[in-house]
Amino acid sequence: CIALTPAQLGAARWPAGAPGLSCVSEEDALPFADLSFDRILLVHGLESAESARRMLREVWRVLKDDGRVLVIAPNRTGMWAYRESTPFGNGHPYSIRQLDRLLAAGLFRAERRDAALWMPPTRMRLVLRAAPLLERAGRRLVPGLSGVTIVEAVKDVYAAMPVRAVARRRLVLAEAG
C-alpha cells in the first residue's frame, strides 16, 4: 500500500498506525516506473487536480496493461459537494457522465459505476445513528443525490491515441475582374 499525497499538501501517513509507504508527488509526474501497478484507488484526487486529464494520463502510464483504477469523486448533485466543511466541498464535483468522458479521454474504459454516501453532512447524534437506514433509503429513493460517485475503469490499451488536427490550407480563388 502506497499513499500518494499532492506535493502542495505535504506527506500524510496512511494508513495510520499500519505498515505502508507514504510519499508526495506532482499529480502529472508520478514517481513510479511505467506499468508498476495492478490497481490504483483514486480518492480525493480528481476533484482537486489542476489538470484531471494529465493526472489520468499519469495513472494510465503507471498501470499495467490489464490494470484497473477505482475513482471516487464528489457527486455534482449530492449535498456533500456543497459543504465546504467536508473534503468533498473543496474542488470540482463530477456527474457520472463527466467521469465517463474524462476517463475515456484518459484512455480508460468505465466498467462499473456505483454511488455511496447518502448520509447528510451533519454531526447530530440522532441522524448519525440513523446512518444505515438513511444509506439504504437514499440508494432506493434518491439515487442521484449520493455524496460520491464511484467508477471502476480498466486501462484501454487498444484505444485510439488522440492526435492533434493538422492545419490545412484552403485555396480560395477570386474572380478576375
Task: Please identify what each model-predicted range represents.
Residues 1-29:
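Class I SAM-dependent methyltransferase SAM/SAH-binding core
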Residues 28-40:
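A short acidic, Gly/Pro-enriched loop at the edge of an enzyme's catalytic core
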Residues 38-51:
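A short SAM/SAH-binding and catalytic strip from SAM-dependent methyltransferases
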Residues 53-68:
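A short glycine-rich, Lys/Arg-flanked "PGG" loop and its adjoining helix->strand segment in the class I
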Residues 73-90:
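Short, glycine-/aromatic-enriched active-site segment of Class I SAM-dependent methyltransferases
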Residues 89-113, 117:
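Short alpha-helix
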Residues 111-136, 144-146:
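Conserved catalytic loop of SAM-dependent methyltransferase domains
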Residues 136-141, 145-177:
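C-terminal lobe and adjacent flexible extensions of AdoMet/dcAdoMet transferase-like proteins
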